[in-house]
């Protein structure tokens, strides 16, 4: 059975630890495992990490994880609050209407919740 894990981040300074945790979790599964489905939900100020701009030090790590199947979601309410247009986000980021709703929905679907 595939494990389902939900990572939550709402502070910019927590991103590096979160991405490290996601990478470690992915690495802990081998070819014999059923695998893991991981979604990262950002709300609050953490949505700023999804902005495509020169010097975004998290971009390469996020892109690599996205290529490995990790899903990234941004809270539309937070984007609106910070006046960030969807067009300025990385292409692998899915915008959800409300981050807290996404967290509730995924946990109802059986996702384990982790907030580093």
Segment roles from a protein language model:
Residues 35-38, 113:
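Anionic, Ser/Thr-rich low-complexity intrinsically disordered regions
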Residues 2-5:
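Extreme N-terminal starter segment of soluble prokaryotic enzymes
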Residues 7-19, 50-53:
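Short, glycine-rich nucleotide/cofactor-binding loops
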Residues 42-50:
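Short, conserved secondary-structure transition motifs
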Residues 29-34, 65:
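Short helix-capping segments at alpha-helix termini
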Residues 51-116:
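A cross-taxonomic marker for long C-terminal extensions/tails that follow the last structured domain
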Residues 38-43, 73-76:
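Short internal beta-strands
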Residues 18-31:
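Histidine-anchored nucleotide/phosphate-binding helix
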């Amino acid at each position: 059975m595939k494990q389902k894990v939900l990572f939550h981040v709402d502070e910019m300074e927590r991103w590096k630890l979160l991405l490290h945790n996601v990478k470690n979790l992915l690495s802990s599964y081998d070819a014999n495992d059923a695998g893991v489905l991981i979604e990262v939900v950002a709300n609050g100020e953490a949505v700023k990490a999804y902005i495509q701009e020169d010097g975004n030090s998290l971009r390469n790590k996020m892109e690599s994880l996205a290529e490995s199947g990790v899903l990234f979601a941004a809270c539309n309410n937070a984007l609106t609050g910070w006046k960030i247009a969807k067009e300025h986000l990385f292409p692998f980021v899915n915008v959800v209407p409300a981050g807290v709703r996404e967290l509730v929905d995924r946990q109802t679907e059986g996702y384990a919740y982790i907030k580093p």
